[in-house]
A protein has these predicted regions:
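Conserved donor NDP-sugar-binding/catalytic core segment of glycosyltransferases
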Residues: 119-176
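A recurrent flexible, glycine/aromatic-enriched loop bordering the glycosyltransferase active site
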Residues: 97-98, 171-215, 219
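Short, acidic, metal-binding catalytic loop of nucleotide-sugar glycosyltransferases
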Residues: 50-60
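Non-catalytic membrane-proximal stalk/linker segments that position and tether the catalytic domains
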Residues: 1-31, 191-192, 265-310, 391-407
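A short, conserved alpha-helix in the catalytic core of glycosyltransferases
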Residues: 124-129, 195-221, 226-254
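Short aromatic/hydrophobic "clamp" motif used to bind/position activated sugar donors
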Residues: 112
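Glycine-rich, basic loop-to-helix element that forms the pyrophosphate-binding segment
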Residues: 90-107, 123-124
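A conserved acidic beta->alpha catalytic loop
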Residues: 67-76, 92
Length: 407
């Protein structure tokens, strides 16, 4: 039977990726414990475990499946497989963090591989991830390139065979939560472009497919169990980063991700849990994230964010302001001049607000919560973070104060 255009497209992606595989050879393969959570995901499990062993290109692994009270025959199916599976049968739907932590406690492997049940592997994925881990220094995690599968429904069809995950970055949002994580290059059809087809350090990988040394996982306390299906992988990545471990994105470990198979089904409950996850994350990591993003922007590393420093100046233009704008632009910052004192809508992109007028109602601005507020004045004003009088070298003096105070 002839293959459909969609099957041919999928096969072309798989065949193309084969050309990039390292096919690592190991003197001794370390044991990898593959941890999978599932809840009524029989159809996902059948896809995941089709030719599972032959696709790994790696022989030394065990599988630990955490079943969260399935009633669709998942347990019976898992028990029928001729694979090294250990089954944890829960009587309730435990969180992603708790399920993985419970499995990690009984894992025999030197490495833990967190894997969603809605993943469809392609050849060589596990060999690639382990090889990447062993051939880089100070690695805390290795993530994979995840691709959306083909979707038949019109609403989702546009994202078919596009990138779902190629590392995580952050961007500004006009919410109290200050910054939002996103998958870089998401929905791109350029699956093998140079930007996403080389190993690189990222701030975070998704835990949909994540390799971690068990010792590091345990030393950092595993996944934080205060989350429920959201932000726990980013939280763990920040623990790695804070402890000077690298998170590496390996694009040659390529898998299809059919998305969100073991989450809460009630929409209102999902929204509530998502809100609680966000609030907990930013209460825990908000200050650290602000500092790291600010450093990233000033140094233009494009590691955590792709954005530049954004500065809004509340003032009419004059000789002093004109020079200040020029000096800040020379630092390759985005600078916007706002001459209207009644304009309070600063926007979510603004990092630094500079006011040349003490009558500006800075307490009522519409912006992110954590922007730095500067008043051009020789008098203190408690509404502002920095008060600095005019000088010929104002831009440099201001940035020195900001770097000393915040970085």
């Amino acid at each position: 039977m002839d293959k459909s255009p969609f099957e041919l497209r999928k096969q072309k992606i798989i065949d193309t990726n084969m050309n990039f595989l390292s096919n690592y050879e190991f003197d001794e393969e370390p044991l990898v414990s593959i941890i999978i959570l599932t809840r009524n995901g029989l159809h996902h499990l059948k896809r995941l475990f089709t030719d599972f062993d032959s696709k790994t290109n790696y022989s030394n692994y065990e599988i630990i499946v955490v079943d969260n009270a399935s009633n669709d025959g998942s347990v019976e199916y898992l028990k029928s497989l001729n694979l090294p599976i250990t089954l944890i049968e829960n009587k309730e739907n435990v969180s992603f963090s708790k399920g993985n932590n419970d499995a990690a406690k009984i894992a025999n492997g030197e490495y833990l591989l967190l894997l969603n049940n809605d993943i469809e592997p392609t050849y060589g994925w596990l060999n690639e991830m382990v090889g990447c881990m062993l051939n880089n220094d100070d690695v805390g995690s290795v993530g994979a390139k995840l691709i959306f599968p083909y979707y038949e429904d019109m609403q989702s069809q546009g994202k078919s065979f596009t990138i779902q995950h190629a590392g995580v970055k952050f961007r500004e949002e006009r919410t109290p939560y200050v910054y939002g994580p996103y998958h870089s290059n998401m929905f791109s059809t350029l699956i093998f472009s140079n930007e996403v087809n080389h190993q690189k350090e990222v701030i975070s990988n998704t835990a949909a497919c994540l390799l971690v040394p068990k010792e590091i996982y345990e030393n950092l306390g595993g996944l934080d169990e205060n989350y429920f299906y959201g932000y726990e992988d980013i939280d763990f990545a920040f623990k790695l980063h804070k402890n000077n471990y690298k998170s590496i994105f390996n694009p040659f470990a390529l898998l299809f991700h059919h998305e969100s198979a073991t989450r809460v089904e009630d929409e209102d409950e999902k929204n509530r849990l998502n809100y609680e996850n966000i609030m907990y994350f930013y209460n825990k990591w908000g200050d650290y994230l602000f500092k790291e993003i600010f450093i990233d922007k000033i140094n233009q590393n494009h590691f955590i964010t792709d954005k530049k420093i954004d500065i809004s100046i509340i003032s009419k233009n004059d000789e002093f302001i004109s020079k200040l704008v020029k000096d800040l632009n020379n630092r390759d910052f985005n600078v916007k001049l706002i001459p209207n004192l009644n304009n309070l809508a600063i926007g979510e992109d603004c990092d630094i607000l500079i006011s040349n007028n003490k009558d500006y109602d800075v307490d009522k601005i519409i912006s992110r919560l954590n922007i730095i507020k500067v008043l051009i004045s020789n008098e203190d004003d408690s509404r502002y973070d920095i008060c600095l009088e005019k000088s010929n070298d104002y831009a440099n003096e201001l940035m020195n104060i900001i770097e000393e105070k915040y970085l």
